[in-house]
Amino acid sequence: VPRGGAAIDRVGVAVQTGVAASTARLMLHAPLTNGLPGALLFDWGTVSTATGGDKEITISATLPAGLVLLTCVVSAAVTLYGFESYGTGIFGNSSQAGSEGSPYRDNGSMTAPNPWGTTGISYSADRTARLAVRAA
């Protein structure tokens, strides 16, 4: 996020395969020194992930300047579209030739974790979930 922050009016997630009656909670976390999510900055609420497609929430927020992490918690085993992480070390690869994607962990509930926590961290096979914000 640029110096001075950035005003946004939408936050969303791209769902590939939904699960009936499921939802995703969309949030923003500050990073820990190791790059994993830390303190909760925003909890924007939930969107339905019962069907595929781009799901968004209309919001009014100003993101703080610097590195921040868009995060989500899903209520079921939905399939999210993602960015392939091969050759993009910033998204969790151990090297430019690595094949690990973004970090995740079983939250055990739909609550907004604050802080995110570092126990039980796993890494997706090869992709980073496609979460997005829109400038106001």
What feature does the model see in each segment?
Residues V1-G5:
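Short, proline-centered helix/strand-breaking motifs
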Residues A20-S99:
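Aromatic- and Gly/Pro-enriched, solvent-exposed loop/edge beta-strand patches characteristic
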Residues V73-A136:
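Short, surface-exposed beta-strand/loop patches at domain edges
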Residues A7-R10, G52-D54, T111-W116:
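Short amphipathic alpha-helical surface micro-motifs
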Residues A6-T17, L70:
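A short beta-strand element within beta-rich, extracytoplasmic domains
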